[in-house]
Amino acid sequence: ANGTNVFLVTSDSTGTPKPKDTVKVTDGKFEFEGKTEMPEIAYVAFEKTPNGNVGFILENGTVTINFDSKNLEKNKISGTKNNDLYQSYNNANLDIQKKVKAIYEANGAFMQKNPETEEEKVKAQGIMDEFQKIQLEMDKRSKDFVAKNQNTFVALLLVENLFYTNKMEASKAKEFYDSLDNDLKETTSGKSVKKHLEMQLPLEKAKA
């Protein structure tokens, strides 16, 4: 709605959200202007709006964000190479987002409480198993996406997440990192992967 504050949010070196700029919605639109040294993951947050966050890649160029608070599937990011790629990744995983949403809608109240009876414990375990299956499918899709989109910032973000959550071996992450252009290695995510590699590679070699 017009007059709504829109916040541009990035993260500091510890991953803590950091508001970077604020504008107001005017005539149903908002605009941020500025320059950035390198691409980074960011999001715009709409004040007092349920599900009012939209993730995108902050980089130089014109990025267009279409936001629909009533139908999140209509949210769209476009305009730069990385954001087009990010949107294609999101589009490919809409079915998974729908599955997660359906589980929450069907079991929201139940998931708020501690299971007490045997029947409740079985149901809770079933929900956990369902989430685990979805997570495994998501991890597989992320790895497939990385394999098809080597040397891109979006793939780097996915590798960073997979590597930090122990879903990717250090040797595989190193293979990916070594093939990156220097400008990608210099991003916050590139430095983060390098730092984690320095810790994890010796541990992996020691186990071998």
What are these regions, as identified by a protein language model?
Residues 151-162:
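Amphipathic alpha-helical repeat scaffolds of TPR domains
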Residues 111-114, 146, 163, 180-185:
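A conserved position within tetratricopeptide repeats
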Residues 172-208:
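N-proximal helix/coil linker or "cap" segments that precede and/or mark the start of modular domains
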Residues 1-140:
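A non-transmembrane, solvent-exposed segment enriched in polar/low-complexity residues
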Residues 131-149, 168-172:
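Amphipathic alpha-helical coiled-coil segments
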Residues 149-153, 185-188:
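Short coil turns that delineate tetratricopeptide repeat
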